[in-house]
């Protein structure tokens, strides 16, 4: 990818939307001070789907067209519905370890079901789930996972739900948005095996999906990871083909 295209895509990733004039005034590349040259690059990136035109001379970054629409297993449905019946006013979400697989380079057999519950109710939820399941863990850290958990054996993991987490509803259940999922994989200690070089690859593969970067960055800010998440996101798009 040429340095000029890298410059434009990085600029687009940093801004929710931008005009041709914005780019022209901000440009650190002397070639882009000529509007005809700049327009040719904007047209090229728009035709390739790397930018989208949303108005006269206004652009947003264009990511993949795939939507994050994971299949929810019967066990996840049963446990979520059980908890929701016990705690109808408590915010919660459910997801599965196998949803991570499409993003990974080194595949891991994670068959866990994760239930995130409001902090004040999460320990109560843990004890309630233990009435149904024997293989249940409450907020396990790296040491506990390495010593006691076999993720391939379908454990249930109860965690605290971060306030104002971006969630969506699917088949009557609340699940994480992909934006939340990506940030949590970086921040949560129980996802230690996804961090480092593997996480960069996960973010690289996430460019195939439709991502609301404003939503992702707001949530990353709540988790005190904004600058690191932004840097990895911007670096990973440069090599995405």
Over which residues does each language-model region extend?
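Positively charged, polyanion-binding regions of nucleic-acid-associated proteins
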Residues: 1-14
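Short beta-edge/loop segments at beta->alpha junctions of small alpha/beta modules
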Residues: 11-88
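Short, charged/polar micro-motifs that form catalytic or ligand-binding hotspots
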Residues: 28-31, 35, 115, 168, ...
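Short, well-structured alpha-helical interface segments that form or flank functional binding sites
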Residues: 37-40, 124, 173, 177-180
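Short gly/ser-rich loop at a beta-strand->alpha-helix junction or flexible surface loop bordering the NTP-binding
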Residues: 57, 74-152
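Residues in well-ordered beta-strands of folded domains
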Residues: 60, 114-116, 157-160
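Hydrophobic alpha-helical interaction segments
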Residues: 133-241
């Amino acid at each position: 990818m040429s340095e000029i295209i890298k410059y434009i895509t990085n600029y687009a990733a940093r801004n929710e939307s931008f005009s041709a004039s914005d780019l022209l005034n901000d440009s650190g590349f002397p070639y882009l001070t000529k509007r005809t040259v700049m327009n040719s690059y904007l047209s090229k990136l728009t035709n390739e789907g790397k930018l989208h035109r949303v108005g006269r001379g206004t652009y947003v970054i264009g990511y993949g067209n795939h939507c994050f629409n994971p299949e929810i297993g019967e066990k996840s449905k049963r446990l979520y519905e059980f908890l929701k019946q016990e705690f109808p006013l408590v915010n919660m979400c459910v997801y599965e370890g196998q949803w991570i697989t499409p993003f990974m380079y080194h595949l891991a057999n994670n068959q866990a079901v994760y239930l995130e519950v409001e902090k004040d109710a999460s320990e109560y939820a843990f004890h309630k789930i233990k009435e149904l399941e024997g293989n249940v863990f409450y907020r396990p850290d790296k040491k506990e996972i390495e010593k006691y958990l076999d993720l391939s054996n379908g454990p249930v993991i109860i965690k605290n739900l971060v306030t104002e987490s971006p969630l969506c509803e699917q088949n009557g259940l609340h699940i994480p948005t992909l934006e939340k999922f990506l940030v949590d994989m970086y921040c949560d200690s129980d996802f230690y095996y996804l961090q480092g070089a593997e996480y960069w690859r996960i973010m690289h593969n996430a460019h195939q999906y439709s991502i609301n970067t404003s939503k992702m960055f707001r949530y990353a800010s709540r988790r005190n990871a904004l600058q690191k998440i932004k840097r990895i996101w911007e670096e990973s798009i440069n090599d995405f083909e």
